[in-house]
Structures are given as C-alpha cells and as structure tokens.
Amino acid sequence: MKKIMIVDDEENLVELVKAIFEQEGYEVIPAYSGKECLEKLEKVKPDLILMDMMMPEMTGKETTKKIRENPKTKNLKVAFLTVVRLSEIGKEELKKLNVLDFITKPFDNEDLVRRVKKILGD
C-alpha cells in the first residue's frame, strides 16, 4: 500500500484529503505543521508528500527545502496543495525545490486523485 503524507495546518482539510485517499486504497499520514512533517519523516518514508505552503512557524517552501537538504529524504516526491497561486511562487522556484505538481485550493476531488495517481504512476 502506497503512503501519502498530508502536511497542512487546517485540520478539516487534512481529514477531507485523508478520507479521499483512504477510499482510493492509500495509507495516509497526517502532519499539521512543517516541524511535525520533518519529525515524522525520521520514521516513515511516504511515496508522496502533499504540502501546504501557508503554515505558521515553517512554510511549505521552507519545509520542502529542509527535506531536500537531508540525504535521507532529498529524493521524496513532493507536490504543493495550496491557496497560493503559481504566479506568486514562480515555476523556477518549484524547479529548484523539485516540486512535482502545484495543486490549488479549492480543488476538485477527482482532479486531485487523478494528479496524485499520475505522480505515483498508479
């Protein structure tokens, strides 16, 4: 069973996305902050991390940068799931962070599942 980590400070959104992907047969690991994400990555290696950008303490961008700096996690797949518009971050920044997709909220459930399956090769 493939694992997806959802990193978002909005508990309701995490629960919604968790329900969507559990129904699709994935194991879902919730993390409610960048710090919690990094702590959980010490113990578990998800097949994909869905990362919010706007979080208190450590942004999704900062968290992804730390993931890329760690030899144990640098090759993990990361996609942003955020209210931030692509024009606000820029494609070059995404390339630098090796972010595989940029999904904006609000999202269509079927589109989200399709895009995640594409990243995971399912």
Language-model segments: which ranges?
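Charged docking surfaces used in two-component/phosphorelay signaling
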Residues: 15-23
